[in-house]
Amino acid sequence: MFMNSMLRVSRQRAAVRSTVSLYRGFVSASIRRNEQNVVKAAAQELANAKEPSDLIGPGGRDGEVPTDLEQATGLERYELLSELSGRDAFDMKPLDASRKGTLTDPIMVTSLDPYRHIGCTGSPSGSHNLIWMTVYKDKLRRCPECGSVYKLKFMGDPNAEHSH
């Protein structure tokens, strides 16, 4: 009795698997036949990158290990191309810690988003432990330890949609 039910189940599974594998083989074969091989040259300088597909590297040549620039794609490639052209892609330099920001003369923080996370270590730099804060567009933010004031300078597109 048990053996008969096991044989019946195994026959059903075998039938389903063969149907699925035939279907998958047929679908992928038709896609491969209709696919056109369009090879586009990758941008080697930031000025030549006009659209997101330009930020896909060419990859390594056969038999060679690719360099970072050949292999990088997307934001990593954008950062590498920016460094080659002498620009700081993501504005990673530290904030001005030579002075304290005041309500009339705050320390300006640039951002492409309507907010940015910053860390304050006081003025002069290192005078207190690191305190993390979030600075929002159109609002001043004061460090609770040293009293330095920060303001966000929004440089992004105000009509941009969030993509997540």
From Swiss-Prot:
InterPro entries: Cyt_c_oxidase_su5b, Cyt_c_oxidase_su5b_sf. This is Cytochrome c oxidase subunit 4, mitochondrial. It comes from the Eukaryota. Pathway: Energy metabolism; oxidative phosphorylation. Gene3D superfamilies: Cytochrome c oxidase, subunit Vb. It is a peripheral membrane protein. GO terms for cellular component: mitochondrial inner membrane; mitochondrion; respiratory chain complex IV. CDD domains: Cyt_c_Oxidase_Vb. Residues 1-33 form a transit peptide. Component of the cytochrome c oxidase, the last enzyme in the mitochondrial electron transport chain which drives oxidative phosphorylation. The respiratory chain contains 3 multisubunit complexes succinate dehydrogenase (complex II, CII), ubiquinol-cytochrome c oxidoreductase (cytochrome b-c1 complex, complex III, CIII) and cytochrome c oxidase (complex IV, CIV), that cooperate to transfer electrons derived from NADH and succinate to molecular oxygen, creating an electrochemical gradient over the inner membrane that drives transmembrane transport and the ATP synthase. It comes from Schizosaccharomyces pombe (strain 972 / ATCC 24843) (Fission yeast). GO terms for biological process: mitochondrial electron transport, cytochrome c to oxygen; proton transmembrane transport. GO terms for molecular function: metal ion binding. Its main location: mitochondrion. It is found in: Mitochondrion inner membrane. Transmembrane segments: none annotated. It holds the Pfam family COX5B. Belongs to the cytochrome c oxidase subunit 5B family. Keywords: Membrane, Metal-binding, Mitochondrion, Mitochondrion inner membrane, Transit peptide, Zinc. PROSITE patterns: COX5B_1 (PS00848), COX5B_2 (PS51359). Component of the cytochrome c oxidase (complex IV, CIV), a multisubunit enzyme composed of a catalytic core of 3 subunits and several supernumerary subunits. The complex exists as a monomer or a dimer and forms supercomplexes (SCs) in the inner mitochondrial membrane with ubiquinol-cytochrome c oxidoreductase (cytochrome b-c1 complex, complex III, CIII). Zn(2+) binds at C120, H128, C143, C146.
